């Protein structure tokens, strides 16, 4: 799915999981994550995680707004092409579940989703207040 991102309809946020900061992209209808954040969380090579994610055939969210992603810190400043994003819950309950299960931390999935939903609600609420 193509995303048309601007600073009005998207917002980056970070959550701390296992002492590591994970960056998420909040959009109106979803909470998105890219495979590099899962790799960071489990100290895995990004390519290894990306391959596992690609095999899962999750719906990709892609954007051409490279400048905004770099401003958000969601993209390496030297990168030319942005990574695709995926729905957070589908990522955690799908390809990332393997890593959580391996470390016997599957209960963390629910915690991450709840914290992310809280961040999303706060962003939507604050955004709506700003419009008034």
Protein language model features and the residues they cover:
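An anion-engaging/catalytic patch
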Residues: 1-132
């Amino acid at each position: 799915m193509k995303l048309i991102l601007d600073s009005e309809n998207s917002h980056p946020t970070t959550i701390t999981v296992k002492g590591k900061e994970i960056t998420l992209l909040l959009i109106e209808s979803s909470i998105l994550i890219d495979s590099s954040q899962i790799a960071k969380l489990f100290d895995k090579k990004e390519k290894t995680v990306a391959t596992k994610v690609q095999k899962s055939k999750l719906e990709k969210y892609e954007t051409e707004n490279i400048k905004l992603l770099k401003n958000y810190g969601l993209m390496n400043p030297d990168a030319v092409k942005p990574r695709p994003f995926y729905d957070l819950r589908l990522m955690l309950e799908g390809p990332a579940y393997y890593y959580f299960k391996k470390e016997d931390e599957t209960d963390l999935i629910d915690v991450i989703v709840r914290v992310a939903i809280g961040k999303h609600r706060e962003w939507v609420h604050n955004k709506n207040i700003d419009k008034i």
